[in-house]
């Protein structure tokens, strides 16, 4: 009898204990709620309004699935790699960058292959997919197909005939007391003068160092010929070497009537010049008694997901959201940037864009930007001397040799 009573009491106690545990577990689950997801997004300052709108749409779309805390921070796309690799764990979860930085980011383990690569590849232009791919694996999400440059010009001052040659553009600028501008402090733009001359620069098989023949002293076009052509341009009263920001300021205040830039400035140029806003491929320039078509670097912008993010799955969802068809269309409407998404690229709105049309025309004379890190500073130094009129009087061949040596340094 005592055994039966003890057994009964033990059963009651166990039931109460298990019931209490169940209630406690249920309460904990109810109090947990959606997971808190904090994400930081990096992008260009000009993208602030656009990206905040895109982020807001993302949070609305996934409302209830997580407790989102997503913020946008300004970080220049051209310096993204260096800043991110300076502290991966402290860097943005999602970031915008130029495609030439992908190899270094992947090598450092900052980005990893994308899971749904087939779907992303199917929706985007092949050239942008190629730019986002390493060893047949997609590492980033294509965002734009317009990371190149062309000519903006004011039709009020420059005719369709003059816009074909740099001589014609400079003549029109000087005659009207205005300026044609180009950023010679940037090696990205300076490539224009060398790219279609037969002089070579590029990446060696090691993927790090460069080869360079820009100092070549023989052939139809020598390095000295290009240097002399640049000095003649620099000495023209209708020319000024200006940064992209200075170009835009000049467009707005009326001092600049032509300049080399990209689609990121198309909206601002159109607002400033109105119906007189024109866009065309880069002109030819005079070099060694002939006209040389100015070349350009081309590429695209990509969205990456930090491999060290605390929420990589949500980071990937956000990256895909930023680059989807709807938001690439919005990007074109708000920023005038050319889409990588095939459906948007084929739309009538894109076909009617004079800036995009100019970029496509220039693409025939463009080259994917594939150079190592030691390309930039030597070219900027050389071009800076040319822009200033070679004030030291140093021999041009010596300067070209120094530049080529710096570019190809190991």
Residue ranges and their predicted role:
Residues 209-243:
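Glycine-centered hinge/linker elements that transmit conformational signals in sensory
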Residues 33-46, 66-73, 94, 139, ...:
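Short, well-ordered beta-strand elements
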Residues 358-410:
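Conserved C-terminal helix/tail region of periplasmic/extracytoplasmic solute-binding proteins
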Residues 63-125, 156, 250, 257-258:
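Extracytoplasmic "Venus flytrap"/periplasmic binding protein-like
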Residues 85-86, 90-93, 121-153, 178-182, ...:
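A structural signal for short loop-to-beta-strand junctions that line the ligand-binding cleft
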Residues 139-143, 149, 170-215, 256:
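Extracytoplasmic/periplasmic solute-binding protein
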Residues 271-334:
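Extracytoplasmic/periplasmic substrate-recognition and gating elements
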Residues 99-149, 161, 167, 279-282:
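Hinge/lid segment of periplasmic solute-binding proteins
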């Amino acid at each position: 009898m005592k055994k039966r009573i003890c057994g009964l009491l033990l059963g009651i106690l166990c039931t109460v204990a298990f019931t209490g545990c169940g209630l406690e577990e249920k309460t904990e689950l109810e109090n947990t709620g959606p997971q808190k997801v904090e994400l930081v997004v990096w992008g260009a300052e000009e993208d602030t309004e656009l990206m905040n709108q895109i982020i807001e749409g993302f949070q609305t779309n996934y409302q209830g699935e997580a407790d989102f805390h997503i913020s946008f921070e300004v970080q220049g796309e051209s310096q993204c790699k260096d800043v991110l690799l300076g502290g991966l764990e402290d860097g943005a979860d999602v970031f915008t960058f130029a495609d030439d930085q992908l190899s270094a980011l992947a090598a450092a383990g900052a980005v990893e292959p994308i899971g749904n690569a087939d779907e992303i590849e199917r929706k985007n232009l092949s050239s942008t997919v190629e730019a986002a791919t390493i060893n047949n694996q997609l590492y980033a999400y294509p965002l734009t197909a317009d990371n190149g440059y062309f000519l903006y010009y004011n039709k009020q001052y420059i005719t369709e005939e003059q816009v074909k040659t740099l001589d014609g553009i400079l003549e029109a600028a000087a005659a009207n007391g205005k300026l044609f501008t180009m950023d010679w402090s940037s090696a990205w733009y300076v490539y224009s003068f060398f790219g279609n001359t037969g002089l070579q620069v590029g990446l060696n098989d090691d993927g790090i160092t460069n080869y360079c023949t820009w100092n070549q002293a023989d052939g139809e076009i020598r390095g000295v010929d290009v240097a002399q052509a640049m000095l003649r341009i620099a000495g023209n009263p209708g020319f000024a070497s200006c940064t992209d920001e200075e170009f835009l300021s000049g467009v707005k205040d009326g001092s600049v009537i032509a300049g080399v830039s990209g689609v990121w400035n198309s909206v601002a140029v159109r607002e400033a010049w109105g119906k007189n806003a024109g866009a065309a491929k880069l002109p030819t320039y005079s070099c060694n008694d002939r006209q040389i078509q100015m070349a350009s670097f081309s590429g695209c912008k990509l969205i990456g997901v930090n491999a060290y993010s605390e929420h990589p799955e949500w980071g990937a969802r956000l990256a895909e959201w930023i680059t989807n068809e709807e938001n690439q269309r919005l990007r074109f409407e708000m920023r005038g940037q050319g889409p990588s998404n095939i459906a948007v690229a084929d739309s009538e709105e894109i076909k009617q864009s004079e800036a995009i049309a100019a970029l496509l025309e220039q693409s025939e004379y463009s080259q994917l930007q594939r150079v190592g890190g030691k390309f930039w500073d030597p070219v900027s130094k050389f071009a800076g001397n040319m822009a200033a009129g070679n004030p030291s009087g140093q021999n041009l061949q010596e300067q070209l040799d120094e530049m080529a040596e710096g570019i190809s340094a190991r």
